[in-house]
Amino acid sequence: MAKLGLNVDHIATVRQARGGSEPDPVTAAAIGELAGAEGITIHLREDRRHIQDRDLEILRRTVQTKLNLEMAATDEMVGIACRIRPEQCTLVPEKRQELTTEGGLDVLGNLAGITRATSSLREAGIVVSLFVDPTVEQIRASKESGADAIEIHTGRYAEARSEKSRHHELAAIREAIRLGNELGLTVHAGHGLNYVNILPLTGLAGIEEFNIGHSIISRAMLVGLDRAVREMVTLIRRP
């Protein structure tokens, strides 16, 4: 049965908007775990626009399930990760001008650097996942890099405007899951998923984890974080 990894980046986004100490992503993570999330995801960006080093350090000590650190494959971030040692690191592409991660990692085009980062992280006892588009080339390159897992970028599926386009993207995700499992990679999925578009994905065998943030935090503003997390967990676990 798939698990929910709750991304608390947007809690930090609200905090940073005023430069204060509230709301605290550490508190949000604890509420999320109590509500059924089986992992906490944060993205420590190079520009520190939301999650701060302090958040990572405290969450490493307080998260009771699994801490998943999203990060760029840079020497600085690899060094931080090897020092903090979260249970998992997910390597993602990063551009300073983007509002959020816009696409999958180009593993094929940056194989040497990603392999080097993956090796360093795995030597530190960290599970390594690569955030990739659902293409054969990127998934095979992910296996070649030595990664333990892939997180399928579901953004195109989430943004599809027609039924035909949605079916096309869903088919690509289904094939990506099949290939990932065939290659021995653990398969996760995330980006743009909400309480409606996740339903077709929960019926696909082979996905072990959904990483979701924006839609849950958005709903939490209306119904509270505990309820928002529980509702998503119920959808993911439905028979």
From Swiss-Prot:
Pathway: Cofactor biosynthesis; pyridoxine 5'-phosphate biosynthesis; pyridoxine 5'-phosphate from D-erythrose 4-phosphate: step 5/5
Compartment(s): Cytoplasm
CDD domains for the chain: PNPsynthase (cd00003)
Annotated keywords: Cytoplasm, Pyridoxine biosynthesis, Transferase
GO cellular component terms listed in the entry, alphabetical order: cytosol
The organism's place on the tree of life at top rank: Bacteria
SUPFAM superfamilies attached to this UniProt entry: Pyridoxine 5'-phosphate synthase
Protein name, as recorded: Pyridoxine 5'-phosphate synthase
Subunit structure, as described in the record: Homooctamer; tetramer of dimers.
GO biological-process terms attached to the record: pyridoxine biosynthetic process
Catalytic residue positions: H43 (proton acceptor), E70 (proton acceptor), H191 (proton donor)
EC number: 2.6.99.2
First-listed, main subcellular location of the protein, grouped into a coarse class: cytoplasm
Presence of keyword Transferase: yes
